[in-house]
Amino acid sequence: MDTVIFDLDGTLLDTLEDLTDSVNYAMEQFGFPVHTIAEIRTFVGNGAPKLLERSIPQGVENPAYEAVLAAFKAHYAEHCEDKTRPYEGVTEMLAELKGQGYHLAIVSNKFDGAVKKLCKKYFGEFISVSIGESAEVKRKPAPDTVYRALRELGCDGSRAVYVGDSEVDIQTAKNASLPCISVTWGFRSEEKLRSEGAPENRLIRTPQALAPLLARLRTEE
């Protein structure tokens, strides 16, 4: 095992406040009710279109849906770095893995421009491949972004592992035939991850726990 594919939001970066602010900006522009951070936490994971579908009354059936989505994207593109920060220990974790020779990539359902912007700002010295949502590739849980990341890295999927914080990530890894490591510090509770099939020996509660788990998995190959 020499390759680690990471989810972004809720795994490497705490983006929840900026996402909430941009959703609520879009809601206010069109006179719709705003949402709490706790509500937005349950809405995220499937990309901006689904996030706004869950946020706006009547979802995609609302005549204003496309305009609200566009307002969200425009606001978030300008404000995605306002309050977003790496989770404590994540930068050190990536430095450790890079130093051990792992190939690292990010795949996300966040729109591609924001993914690349955030990756470059926070993790550019560790991660060279970052792929987000675009018209060119199916979003997670389809395995397409994972396959693209592996191609861009020049790595074999049989030697890769996927790391994420949600049920979408568990399903993505399954669809890509990769083992999945689930983190408990993100947008889903440990109970939720367990209910979605995350095994105890593939759950980690701190970033510092990833390198030892990867080392153990390598011995099992």
Model-identified regions with their sequence ranges:
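Metal-dependent phosphoesterase signature
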Residues: E53-E92, Q100
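Residue-level detector of anion-binding/catalytic polar loops
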Residues: P33, H103, P179
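Conserved hydrophobic/aromatic "anchor" residues
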Residues: F6-L8, F72, V146
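Alpha-helical substrate-recognition element adjacent to the catalytic core
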Residues: Q29-G59, E88
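Asp-based, Mg2+/Mn2+-dependent phosphohydrolase catalytic module
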Residues: M1-D2, A38, K98, D112, ...
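Substrate-recognition element of Asp-dependent hydrolases with the DxDx(T/V) motif
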Residues: V23, V90-K120
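Active-site neighborhood of HAD-like aspartate-dependent phosphohydrolases
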Residues: M1-T42
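Generic enzyme active-site microenvironment
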Residues: I5-D7, V107, V163
